[in-house]
Amino acid sequence: MTYNEALVRNALINELGAVTNLKPKAMTEKILLGIHYRKAAEDWLKTREAISKEENATDEVKNEAIQTKATEDCGLADKRMSREAFEQVVEAVLPLGSIASFLAVSEAENEAPEIPVAMWLQAFAEALVEE
C-alpha cells in the first residue's frame, strides 16, 4: 500500500468522524481503521516536513521528492471495513444528502466542499470496504 492510498483512506475515515449517529459496529470499525491509517498519515507528515526543510534543494526537486515518496510503500497492511459495518455507515450518512469531502478540493480551495452522499459513499466503498 502506498502513502497516497493510505492518506486517502485516512481522510475518508476522518470525514466519517463528522457523522455522529453511527451504530456500534460501524463506529468500532471506523475507530480501529482510523488508528491503523493514522500511522501512515503521521509518518507521511514527518517525511514531507523533512523534505520541505531541505535547504540545498530547489522547490522543484523538493516537490519531485515528495511525489516520489507518496507512491512508495508505506508498510501498512490493507485493512478494510466489513460490509455489515458499511451498511450501517450508509444508513447513517444517506439522510445527510451531502458531506464535506477532500475529494472535491482543488488546489485553490482551503475548505472541503460538500459533495453528494452517493458519490462519497462510492469512493469510501472503493477505498475501504471488503469486496
Question: What do the PLM-derived regions correspond to, one by one?
Answer:
Residues 1-131:
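A composition-driven surface/loop motif
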